[in-house]
Regions:
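An amphipathic, basic-hydrophobic alpha-helix
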Residues: 2-8, 154-157, 211-220
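Conserved SAM-binding loop
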Residues: 3-134, 156, 233-235
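A conserved catalytic-core signature of glycosyltransferases
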Residues: 79, 147, 152, 230
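Short, glycine-/aromatic-enriched active-site segment of Class I SAM-dependent methyltransferases
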Residues: 126-150, 158-159
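A structural motif corresponding to the C-terminal end of an alpha-helix
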Residues: 160-166
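Conserved S-adenosyl-L-methionine
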Residues: 166-176
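A C-terminal cap/extension of S-adenosyl-L-methionine-dependent methyltransferases
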Residues: 175-254
């Protein structure tokens, strides 16, 4: 399940990408196979990094190694003190991570530090009003160790990145079909995954993720701009010279 659009990230062969807070590696794996790049996955949790590695072991690159080789590296590390030199990465993904970090401003400063001039980043956090409903229905949803510590307003987070010097390129919403699932989970008990309705909805989402048939693609296309679970934003770290225009014309999402 990808949240960041790798085409909007404009990932190219030969580039180096960091998936910051990679979790089980969904974006690390996707970037690795999307282009002949070096995909680096980093997470605070060692077990998560082990699962990411297992994903590569289970799905090796079987294409002939001609031209620019693919490469991946995995690491355990803290978003507030990243183990990389300044200007290390052409592209960076930080998906559904910042809402977990009390000092998220420190993480933003590290993102600025390690992104190359001319680099592009893709950031996603929970969309404000669907997240507010989850918090309203359930204390357990966010009041757990390692859980969500804040609800972002997209305009404020954009301003935080722009204050560092990043240039905003655009945004979109994603995973609209997932919002009602989490509202349901929160309403009946976020840890009650045996409920018949929860199990049925989870199965539907698994079909969307694994097979994505046409009816679910159409439903997702309608739901994403209305109630996307995640808001995704793209920024460039400027270098000398004028910046290109927005990725998709005027920004029309709330």
């Amino acid at each position: 399940m990808q949240t960041i659009n790798l085409d909007k990230l404009d990932l190219c062969d030969g580039q180096t990408l960091l998936d910051l807070g990679c979790g089980h590696g969904r974006h690390t794996h996707a970037a690795y196979f999307h282009k002949r790049c070096r995909a680096v996955g980093l997470d605070l949790g060692f077990e998560d990094v082990k699962i990411t590695r297992a994903g590569f072991d289970a799905n090796p690159d079987l294409e002939p190694q001609t031209g620019t080789p693919r490469r991946y590296d995995l690491s355990v590390g803290d978003a507030l003190a990243l183990p990389f030199a300044d200007d290390s990465f052409d592209r960076l993904i930080c998906s559904e991570v910042l809402e977990h970090i009390p000092d998220y401003q420190g993480a933003l400063a590290e993102i600025w530090r390690i992104t190359k001039p001319g680099g592009r980043i893709g950031i996603s956090v929970p969309h404000r009003w669907p997240e507010q409903i989850c918090w309203l229905f359930s204390e357990d949803y966010h009041n757990t160790p390692g859980g969500h510590v804040r609800i972002f307003r997209a305009a404020d987070l954009r301003a935080d990145f722009e204050a560092l010097g990043f240039a905003y390129r655009g945004k979109h919403l994603k995973h609209g079909l997932h919002s009602p699932y989490w509202w349901l989970r929160c309403a009946i008990g976020v840890n009650n995954d045996r409920n018949i309705f929860v199990r049925a909805y989870k199965k539907l989402l698994e079909i969307e993720i694994l097979k994505n048939p046409l009816p679910l693609r159409l439903a997702s296309a309608l739901a994403d701009p209305l109630m996307g679970k995640s808001v995704v934003m793209y920024f460039d770290k400027p270098q000398d010279g004028p910046l290109d225009g927005p990725l998709d014309g005027p920004d029309s999402t709330a």
